[in-house]
């Protein structure tokens, strides 16, 4: 086995272990934030939505800067620094008794993610061969789902005693992850050339097709990030312990269906068709959520939503990676998170505001119908973009 093949092989295992630690650290804390501050402390959902939206927007919106810096200086220092910063954010969250302190803790957490997330994504693109990326992204998603359930179960158990224990556990896991990267991650370059920060960012911004695709995905992420789902499950069930079953459903579906669906669909369908089909299922499953009154009906709709996500997400990741320029991988993968920044922030803040508005106006279906409509519009916009791309390709072939 050549040294390059050996590095790729070892790199896969490193990425999987690193991802599990990150997912556990995140899901121990974040699924319980809305329950802690909305249900236990009585804050308005919009206050928590602002905090979560701020974290999302900072982490993903500034990702192009984190990616461009990593293109210049390498992945390792950015990843280690970012993980320690997130640990500090979680520690601060444990003592948050005022909205401004929760917002500050989410700001720290988001800045940490800005530093470590783009280089980690770029490492996947660097180490995994193009023909294997779809399946590897599926494995990462399966791991995400299993880690989400384990983290949520652990966090729910710790929440019975003290929310500070929840945050301390998340912080310790990110410190361990930082140590793991500092000890074992080689000083790999992310791009084929050591690209200056400004040049990497400029290269992305001039790629109009990539920029349009990323910005359109904001509508997809408005659906994907919904903080209201745990609150809805809690309201219908009447107990916060029911939230863990929502994550258990996601894990079971992901572990049993994600990899087989990815393997089968990559042989029969284009990436863009898989992304659009998943998005359509997600959109249609959101619309009736506010109209259900039983937990069984709600979990059925959540199952449909997760199946849509299982179809769409590996295709989205693979499509984003395939569009990235190898000369500025960090910058491209950082910018690819901008749709998540915009959609996540609007989804969190707007979703929380609509949820409060729907409750006060006795129209609980309002936020869910709006999300479904946004998903349909995003579906149509992506369809138009992909049809334009195919038309341009046919024109070039005809001219040739």
From Swiss-Prot:
Stretches of the chain found on the membrane's Cytoplasmic side: 1-12, 117-138, 186-213, 263-274, 319-337, 387-400
Parts of the chain that traverse the membrane: 13-33, 99-116, 139-159, 165-185, 214-232, 242-262, 275-295, 298-318, 338-358, 366-386
Membrane topology (Periplasmic): 34-98, 160-164, 233-241, 296-297, 359-365
CDD domains per record: MFS_MdtH_MDR_like
Cited PANTHER family: MULTIDRUG RESISTANCE PROTEIN MDTH, RESISTANCE PROTEIN MDTM, PUTATIVE-RELATED-RELATED
Entry similarity comment: Belongs to the major facilitator superfamily. DHA1 family. MdtH (TC 2.A.1.2.21) subfamily.
Identification of the protein by name: Multidrug resistance protein MdtH
């Amino acid at each position: 086995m050549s040294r390059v093949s050996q590095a790729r092989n070892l790199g896969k295992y490193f990425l999987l272990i690193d991802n599990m630690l990150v997912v556990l650290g995140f899901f121990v804390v974040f699924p319980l934030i809305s329950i802690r501050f909305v249900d236990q402390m009585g804050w308005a959902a919009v206050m928590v939505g602002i905090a979560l939206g701020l974290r999302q927007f900072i982490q993903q919106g500034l990702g192009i800067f984190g990616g461009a810096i990593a293109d210049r200086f390498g992945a390792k220092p950015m990843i280690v620094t970012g993980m320690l910063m997130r640990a500090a954010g979680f520690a601060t969250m444990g003592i948050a008794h005022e909205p401004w302190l929760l917002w500050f803790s989410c700001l720290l957490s988001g800045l940490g993610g800005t530093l470590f997330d783009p280089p980690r994504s770029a490492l996947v693109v660097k180490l995994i061969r193009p023909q294997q990326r779809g399946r590897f992204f599926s494995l990462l998603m399966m791991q995400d789902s299993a880690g989400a359930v384990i983290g949520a179960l652990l966090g729910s158990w710790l929440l019975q005693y003290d929310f500070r224990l929840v945050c301390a556990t998340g912080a310790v896991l990110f410190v361990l992850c930082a140590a793991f990267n500092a000890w074992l991650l080689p000083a790999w370059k992310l791009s084929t050339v050591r690209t200056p920060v400004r040049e990497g960012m400029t290269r992305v911004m001039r790629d109009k097709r990539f920029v349009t695709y990323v910005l359109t995905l904001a509508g997809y992420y408005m659906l994907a990030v919904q903080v209201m789902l745990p609150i809805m499950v809690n309201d219908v069930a009447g107990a916060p312990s029911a939230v863990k079953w929502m994550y258990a459903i996601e894990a079971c579906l992901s572990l049993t269906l994600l990899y087989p669906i990815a393997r089968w669909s990559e042989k029969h369908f284009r990436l863009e068709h898989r992304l659009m089909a998943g998005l359509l299922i997600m959109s249609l499953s959101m619309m009736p959520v506010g109209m259900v009154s039983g937990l069984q009906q709600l979990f059925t709709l959540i199952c449909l939503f997760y199946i849509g996500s299982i179809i769409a997400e590996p295709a989205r990741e693979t499509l984003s990676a395939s569009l990235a320029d190898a000369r500025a991988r960090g910058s491209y993968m950082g910018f690819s998170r901008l749709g998540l920044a915009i959609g996540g922030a609007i989804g969190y803040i707007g979703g929380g505001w609509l949820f409060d508005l729907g409750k006060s106006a006795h129209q609980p279906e309002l936020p869910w119908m709006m999300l479904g409509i946004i998903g349909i519009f995003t579906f149509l916009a992506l369809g138009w973009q992909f049809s334009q791309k195919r038309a341009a390709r046919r024109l070039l072939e005809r001219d040739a």
